[in-house]
């Protein structure tokens, strides 16, 4: 490929970081061919939340699985860092700001702070959570585009674009609506959001109208910059089949490559965004600076801790992106091309999820098919760990998740209360009442085999990026615990064979400890509660701890149920809330 960056890599200059990015001894993955953990470092990112509104249920489809993945990697001794940040530029923010009579910066700052405070409430803790409006992101965006220019991958040309004479401005992206040239559906300026989902280049939209005033725009020529995406077609044909991750990411991207690539307009006529040096009223398109925000977030962390961001972006490691299924195009075509052309490492994996539905309908904020995580869930006192479990366990990661309150209630009541919580509370309560401490005993071979089976299923789930396999393994182990406890009947043995009863409870508490280890990445708050009831204040125990012996004679904490039954009346009330919202949106 012409114009390759002449940049010395200096891999050996990167020091091992002084912070604890590796939480336990590295577990071998050679015996059964597991992908993870890896000897090389891993950087995990999540698609940036767009800060024109609060967190909703569709956000969690990306962030919860990514957090589960990172937590398990750390349990296996993997060196891993986890980055995200707010996506702060683009027309959705400027349109909202105009509607509310405030500046785009006010909108951005309000919702950026919302997400900073929100993620810990749902148990998600990033190594760094940044912002694409941070000066580091402005600088890194300009540096990367400059590198692409130097290597012959960016050029400028005059382009006829829609201009609204009534509003006296060009109409980038969401400032116009019209007809998709590919499928004929109603579409916005940069994407067919109601039909085929295709990315639309400026000027492609048919029969455009100003989305603010409805005026039919004039076409006026103006200078814009383009990424020569066509120059990366051969690279993408080789890269995408080898890219790890979910099939929908690879297959969708390959389908678009097979259909023929076009050069990509990387600038917009706006004042809000990363300004193009030397060009008045021109900024880089939001999908240029947004993924660069992953790099800038790493730089923010490096400045704060004394780390080296290049260790992850130009070094020996693996880059893994977790994204929603609606942004595959950007992460599997534009982004690898930009990284390749500017001399950065390309992603090892792109993990794209299925879409989200609410009450059977395609997720839509404007049409009322939305669940606001704080207003509708957390503020009502509902359990954040139960929601994490629901997101992980509802279906396979690449299948559509259809959120409805009835299914949520059924999962909580049957699986969390009836199976997992039932075993844990029965085992801990019996032990506390009869012994007060962890009794002596030997772990039975059958019991140990069940835990080993659960660990293997979890590692398979990590390899395949299938988080339902992980939650199913936890639930299956709890179901086994219930069967074991019921079949051994220690309440009878305390009278007929006290020593055997003690051994049964020892095994039950050993299973309880294993569950605390294995469920922590899915339900960290509940795992911490189990450790306290086991008489320990542990967090982030390594995966190997699931198979380690109990500390006999440890004084047990006071047992308490982990989960609460959700009454049918509450489910009906929550379902009615969504129905009312939909009815109001539909007028």
Description of each model-found segment:
Residues 417, 421, 448, 452, ...:
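Generic structural concept
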């Amino acid at each position: 490929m012409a114009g390759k960056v002449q940049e010395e890599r200096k891999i050996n200059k990167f020091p091992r970081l002084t912070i604890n990015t590796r939480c336990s001894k590295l577990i071998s993955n050679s015996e059964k061919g597991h992908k993870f953990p890896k000897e090389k470092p891993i950087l995990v990112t999540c698609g940036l939340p767009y800060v024109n509104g609060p967190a909703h249920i569709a956000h969690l489809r990306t962030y919860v699985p990514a957090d589960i993945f990172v937590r398990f990697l750390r349990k296996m001794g993997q060196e891993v860092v986890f980055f995200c940040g707010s996506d702060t530029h683009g027309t959705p923010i400027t349109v909202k700001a105009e509607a509310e009579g405030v500046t785009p910066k006010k909108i951005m700052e309000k919702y950026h702070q919302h997400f900073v405070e929100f993620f810990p409430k749902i148990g998600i803790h990033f190594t760094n959570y940044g912002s694409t409006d941070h000066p580091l992101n402005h600088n890194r965006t300009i540096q990367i585009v400059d590198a692409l220019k130097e290597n012959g991958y960016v050029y400028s040309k005059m382009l006829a674009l829609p201009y609204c004479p009534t509003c006296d401005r060009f109409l980038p992206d969401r400032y116009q609506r019209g007809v998709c040239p590919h499928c004929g559906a109603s579409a916005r300026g940069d994407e067919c959001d109601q039909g085929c989902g295709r990315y639309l280049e400026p000027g492609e939209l048919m029969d455009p109208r100003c989305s603010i005033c409805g005026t039919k725009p004039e076409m006026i020529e103006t200078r814009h910059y383009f990424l020569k995406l066509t120059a990366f077609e051969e690279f993408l044909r080789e890269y995408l089949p080898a890219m790890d991750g979910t099939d929908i990411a690879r297959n969708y991207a390959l389908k678009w490559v097979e259909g023929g690539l076009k050069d990509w307009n990387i600038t917009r006529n706006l004042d809000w965004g990363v300004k193009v040096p030397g060009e008045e009223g021109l900024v880089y398109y939001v999908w240029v600076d947004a993924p660069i925000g992953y790099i800038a977030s790493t730089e923010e962390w490096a400045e704060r801790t004394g780390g080296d961001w290049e260790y992850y972006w130009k070094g020996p490691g693996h880059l893994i992106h977790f994204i929603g299924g609606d942004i595959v195009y950007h992460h599997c075509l534009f982004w690898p091309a930009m990284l390749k052309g500017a001399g950065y490492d390309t992603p090892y994996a792109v993990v794209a999820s299925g879409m989200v539905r609410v009450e059977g309908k395609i997720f839509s904020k404007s049409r009322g098919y939305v669940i606001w995580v704080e207003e509708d869930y957390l503020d009502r006192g509902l359990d954040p760990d139960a929601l994490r479990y629901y997101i992980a366990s509802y279906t396979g990661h690449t299948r559509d998740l259809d959120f409805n309150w009835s299914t949520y209630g059924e999962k909580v009541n049957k699986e969390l209360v009836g199976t997992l919580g039932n075993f844990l509370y029965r085992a801990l309560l019996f032990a506390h009442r009869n012994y007060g401490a962890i009794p002596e005993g030997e772990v039975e071979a059958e019991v140990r085999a069940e835990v080993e089976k659960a660990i293997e299923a979890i590692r398979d789930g990590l390899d395949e990026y299938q988080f339902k396999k992980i939650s199913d393994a936890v639930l299956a182990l709890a179901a086994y615990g219930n069967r074991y406890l019921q079949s051994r009947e220690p309440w009878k043995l305390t009278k007929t064979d006290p020593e055997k009863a003690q051994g049964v409870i020892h095994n039950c508490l050993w299973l309880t400890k294993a569950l605390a280890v294995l469920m922590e990445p899915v339900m960290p708050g509940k795992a911490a509660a189990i450790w306290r009831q086991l008489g320990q204040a542990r967090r982030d125990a390594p995966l190997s701890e699931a198979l380690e012996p109990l500390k006999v004679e440890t004084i047990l904490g006071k047992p308490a149920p982990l989960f609460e039954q959700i009454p049918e009346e509450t489910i009906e009330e929550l379902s009615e809330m969504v129905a009312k919202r939909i009815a109001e949106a539909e007028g």
